[in-house]
Amino acid sequence: MGYTIQLDKDGDYYWDDDSHDPYMRANAAAFHAAPHAAAFNAAAPHAAAFNAAAPHAAAFNAAAPHAAAFNTATHHAFHEPFIKLNLTDKNIFNGLGFILIVIFIYLLLITLQQMLTRHIYNTVQHCVKAHLDSKNLQSR
Protein backbone atom coordinates (compact mmCIF):
# COMPACT_ATOMS: atom_id res chain seq x y z
CA MET A 1 0.00 0.00 0.00
CA GLY A 2 1.36 3.40 -0.87
CA TYR A 3 0.76 6.67 -2.61
CA THR A 4 2.63 9.61 -4.08
CA ILE A 5 1.89 13.24 -3.32
CA GLN A 6 3.54 15.90 -5.44
CA LEU A 7 3.23 19.42 -6.75
CA ASP A 8 2.91 19.95 -10.47
CA LYS A 9 4.52 22.86 -12.34
CA ASP A 10 1.51 25.12 -11.65
CA GLY A 11 1.70 24.51 -7.91
CA ASP A 12 -1.36 22.24 -7.82
CA TYR A 13 -1.02 19.07 -5.80
CA TYR A 14 -2.33 15.65 -6.72
CA TRP A 15 -1.92 12.03 -5.69
CA ASP A 16 -2.91 8.59 -6.79
CA ASP A 17 -5.91 6.98 -5.10
CA ASP A 18 -5.46 4.46 -2.35
CA SER A 19 -8.79 3.52 -0.79
CA HIS A 20 -7.13 1.81 2.19
CA ASP A 21 -5.29 4.90 3.34
CA PRO A 22 -7.06 7.10 5.93
CA TYR A 23 -5.71 10.31 4.38
CA MET A 24 -7.08 9.31 1.00
CA ARG A 25 -10.46 8.53 2.57
CA ALA A 26 -10.47 11.93 4.30
CA ASN A 27 -9.69 13.59 0.98
CA ALA A 28 -12.45 11.66 -0.82
CA ALA A 29 -14.87 12.71 1.91
CA ALA A 30 -13.83 16.32 1.36
CA PHE A 31 -14.66 16.17 -2.34
CA HIS A 32 -18.07 14.60 -1.65
CA ALA A 33 -18.92 16.90 1.27
CA ALA A 34 -19.84 20.04 -0.69
CA PRO A 35 -23.35 20.23 0.90
CA HIS A 36 -21.72 20.05 4.32
CA ALA A 37 -19.38 22.87 3.33
CA ALA A 38 -22.32 24.99 2.14
CA ALA A 39 -24.12 24.39 5.44
CA PHE A 40 -20.94 25.26 7.28
CA ASN A 41 -20.61 28.55 5.39
CA ALA A 42 -24.28 29.40 6.03
CA ALA A 43 -23.89 28.68 9.75
CA ALA A 44 -20.71 30.74 10.05
CA PRO A 45 -21.41 34.34 8.97
CA HIS A 46 -17.90 35.38 9.96
CA ALA A 47 -16.63 33.23 7.07
CA ALA A 48 -18.90 35.14 4.67
CA ALA A 49 -17.62 38.40 6.10
CA PHE A 50 -14.08 37.15 5.63
CA ASN A 51 -14.77 36.32 1.98
CA ALA A 52 -16.26 39.78 1.44
CA ALA A 53 -13.24 41.41 3.08
CA ALA A 54 -10.74 39.27 1.18
CA PRO A 55 -11.73 39.18 -2.51
CA HIS A 56 -8.53 37.36 -3.45
CA ALA A 57 -9.65 34.43 -1.27
CA ALA A 58 -13.07 34.45 -2.96
CA ALA A 59 -11.37 34.53 -6.37
CA PHE A 60 -9.19 31.59 -5.34
CA ASN A 61 -12.23 29.63 -4.16
CA ALA A 62 -14.05 30.40 -7.42
CA ALA A 63 -11.04 29.30 -9.46
CA ALA A 64 -10.52 26.10 -7.45
CA PRO A 65 -13.87 24.84 -6.11
CA HIS A 66 -12.33 21.53 -5.09
CA ALA A 67 -9.93 23.44 -2.83
CA ALA A 68 -12.83 25.38 -1.28
CA ALA A 69 -14.69 22.18 -0.45
CA PHE A 70 -11.47 20.61 0.74
CA ASN A 71 -10.48 23.49 2.99
CA THR A 72 -13.83 23.91 4.74
CA ALA A 73 -14.81 20.27 5.16
CA THR A 74 -11.57 18.64 6.27
CA HIS A 75 -9.30 21.46 7.34
CA HIS A 76 -7.94 19.45 10.25
CA ALA A 77 -7.89 16.07 8.51
CA PHE A 78 -5.36 16.63 5.76
CA HIS A 79 -3.04 19.54 4.97
CA GLU A 80 -1.85 20.53 1.54
CA PRO A 81 1.57 19.03 0.74
CA PHE A 82 4.30 21.26 -0.57
CA ILE A 83 6.90 18.73 -1.71
CA LYS A 84 6.84 15.37 -3.42
CA LEU A 85 6.50 12.49 -0.98
CA ASN A 86 6.86 8.96 -2.24
CA LEU A 87 5.37 6.75 0.46
CA THR A 88 5.39 3.14 -0.65
CA ASP A 89 6.09 -0.22 0.93
CA LYS A 90 7.67 -1.60 -2.24
CA ASN A 91 10.92 0.29 -1.79
CA ILE A 92 13.89 -1.59 -0.30
CA PHE A 93 15.00 1.58 1.52
CA ASN A 94 11.90 1.69 3.68
CA GLY A 95 11.41 1.06 7.37
CA LEU A 96 13.17 -1.92 8.88
CA GLY A 97 14.92 -2.87 5.63
CA PHE A 98 16.58 0.53 5.46
CA ILE A 99 17.78 0.24 9.07
CA LEU A 100 19.20 -3.23 8.44
CA ILE A 101 21.03 -2.07 5.31
CA VAL A 102 22.54 0.88 7.19
CA ILE A 103 23.69 -1.39 10.04
CA PHE A 104 25.20 -3.87 7.57
CA ILE A 105 27.13 -1.13 5.74
CA TYR A 106 28.27 0.33 9.08
CA LEU A 107 29.61 -3.05 10.25
CA LEU A 108 31.28 -3.63 6.89
CA LEU A 109 33.04 -0.26 7.09
CA ILE A 110 34.18 -0.94 10.66
CA THR A 111 35.58 -4.32 9.60
CA LEU A 112 37.43 -2.84 6.62
CA GLN A 113 38.81 -0.04 8.78
CA GLN A 114 40.10 -2.53 11.37
CA MET A 115 41.68 -4.69 8.66
CA LEU A 116 43.39 -1.66 7.13
CA THR A 117 44.60 -0.44 10.52
CA ARG A 118 46.02 -3.88 11.36
CA HIS A 119 47.74 -4.07 7.97
CA ILE A 120 49.32 -0.62 8.39
CA TYR A 121 50.43 -1.47 11.95
CA ASN A 122 52.05 -4.74 10.83
CA THR A 123 53.78 -3.03 7.89
CA VAL A 124 55.19 -0.26 10.08
CA GLN A 125 56.29 -2.78 12.70
CA HIS A 126 58.05 -4.85 10.03
CA CYS A 127 59.80 -1.77 8.59
CA VAL A 128 60.94 -0.59 12.04
CA LYS A 129 62.27 -4.05 12.89
CA ALA A 130 64.12 -4.28 9.57
CA HIS A 131 65.58 -0.81 10.12
CA LEU A 132 66.76 -1.65 13.65
CA ASP A 133 68.24 -4.95 12.45
CA SER A 134 70.19 -3.13 9.74
CA LYS A 135 71.49 -0.64 12.33
CA ASN A 136 72.59 -3.51 14.58
CA LEU A 137 74.38 -5.19 11.69
CA GLN A 138 76.16 -1.94 10.78
CA SER A 139 77.33 -1.28 14.34
CA ARG A 140 79.05 -4.67 14.71
Curated annotation (Swiss-Prot):
Membrane topology type: Single-pass membrane protein
Record field: transmembrane: 92-112
Keywords: Glycoprotein, Host membrane, Membrane, Transmembrane, Transmembrane helix, Virion
Superkingdom, natural source: Viruses
Keyword rRNA processing: no
Glycan-linked positions: 86
Cellular localisation: Host membrane; Virion
Cellular component GO terms, alphabetical: host cell membrane; membrane; virion component
Entry keyword ATP-binding: no
Family that this chain belongs to: Belongs to the asfivirus B117L family.
Protein name: Uncharacterized protein B117L
Species of origin: African swine fever virus (isolate Pig/Kenya/KEN-50/1950)
